Amino acid sequence: MMEESGIETTPPSTPPPSTIGTSVPAATTAISTPVPPIFSSPLAAPVFSPLPSFAQPIFSTPLPSSVPPLRTSVPLTYAPPLPVTGVHSPPAHTSVPAAFSSPLPAFSSPPSFPPPPLNTTPGPVLTAPPTGPPVGGFSMSSHYDITKGHAGRAPQTPLMPTYSAAPVTVLPNPVIQAPLAGSGSSITFPEEPEDSRVHTMHVDGSAGGIWGFFKGVAGNPMVKSVLDKTKHSMETVITTLDPGMASYIRTGGEMDIVVTSVKEVKVAAVREAFQEVFGMAVVTGEDGQSNIAPQPVGYAAGLKGAQERIDSLRRSGMIHEKQPAVSVENFIAELLPDKWFDIGCVIIDDPTHGIRLETFTQATPVPLEYVQQAQNLTPQDYNLRWSGLSVTVGEVLERSLAHVCRTDWHVAFTGMSRRQMIYSAAKALAGMYKQRLPPRIL
């Protein structure tokens, strides 16, 4: 394959860097000491002579067949290639003699550079390239087979650079770092200085426990306002879906009212009015006696009958003498000549706070003939004739008109029920009563 003139007939492909500048005796396969990339030994391989114009070989590309083969700077004789193995054996000598006893012939010219020092340390073992991205410089390593790469043979794999990551130096953080207890991670986080104000607030908040926390939140005016609005909204939804739930939801609190009647038309109207004004109120009914005529005539008789109902309950012990009570009494009055009206008197009596208030419902017109019938049905010697009639206007209307109830005939004449009339008056009464109560009661 080689001629005596030293002309190379092998393909002009660049051998791997492991063969560049390597001077090995017959028993030595590798040199572990790193050498310069261009000229590393006085002995050059017979198959390659690096060009002096390149500072460092970066890539090796096979030359086309049209390019003439490279010549070595010194005529060399052919030497059989040394087998390349993955295991490096220690060199036989620690210094380079002037002449070798190996079959390789000596150069006829002196070397241009001094020989590199050799040591006895085994060379590094070739490792696979790292999986990470290139960080530092790179080095090329490969195995080269001279039997391949000819025309018609197996193609030669071009040399690819393999990268090695340079060691990264981690500078210490000047911020104080707190060690992580019970964790195997090396990540540390800066420790922030504690705020004494936050610590004081935490201690003060935890001094009262969970109840102290709720007490503090409930005492906040803004929180209380939000809670009240939320509660009112929920009550509105519930009472809209089921109006009968209003009395159960709003029953409670310090406001306790007794109505001097067991009729639902009166008790329900007063309860709804006071719960609307005070939010929470307990309203119950007791049957009180008016001790006047069943159909009072005139304002004085109506007011007398309402007050007598309260007094009768207190005399009988049905309610406490200091118990606030509300009484409703309907009467008729001739406000204009031959014009009669039905009116309801609503009063509240609170002996504890010395409050006594009166109001009246709207006036409902009553036809004159029905009032005259009630007067004719009342005996002349009726003992309570001074206060009114023995027959009510409702009884007369019930006898005279179909589908009319004696207790709620107002809706047939006005389209507005008696309960609505009492509710309107009772709500106005509750508003006046609330204004006169001491603030601690509210």
From Swiss-Prot:
<dbReference type="GO" id="GO:0010669">
    <property type="term" value="P:epithelial structure maintenance"/>
</dbReference>
<comment type="similarity">
    <text>Belongs to the PRRC1 family.</text>
</comment>
<dbReference type="InterPro" id="IPR026534">
    <property type="entry name" value="PRRC1"/>
</dbReference>
<dbReference type="GO" id="GO:0005737">
    <property type="term" value="C:cytoplasm"/>
</dbReference>
<dbReference type="Pfam" id="PF01931">
    <property type="entry name" value="NTPase_I-T"/>
</dbReference>
<dbReference type="InterPro" id="IPR029001">
    <property type="entry name" value="ITPase-like_fam"/>
</dbReference>
<dbReference type="GO" id="GO:0005794">
    <property type="term" value="C:Golgi apparatus"/>
</dbReference>
<dbReference type="InterPro" id="IPR026533">
    <property type="entry name" value="NTPase/PRRC1"/>
</dbReference>
<feature type="region of interest" description="Disordered">
    <location>
        <begin position="1"/>
        <end position="27"/>
    </location>
</feature>
<dbReference type="GO" id="GO:0034237">
    <property type="term" value="F:protein kinase A regulatory subunit binding"/>
</dbReference>
<keyword id="KW-0333">Golgi apparatus</keyword>
<protein>
    <recommendedName>
        <fullName>Protein PRRC1-A</fullName>
    </recommendedName>
</protein>
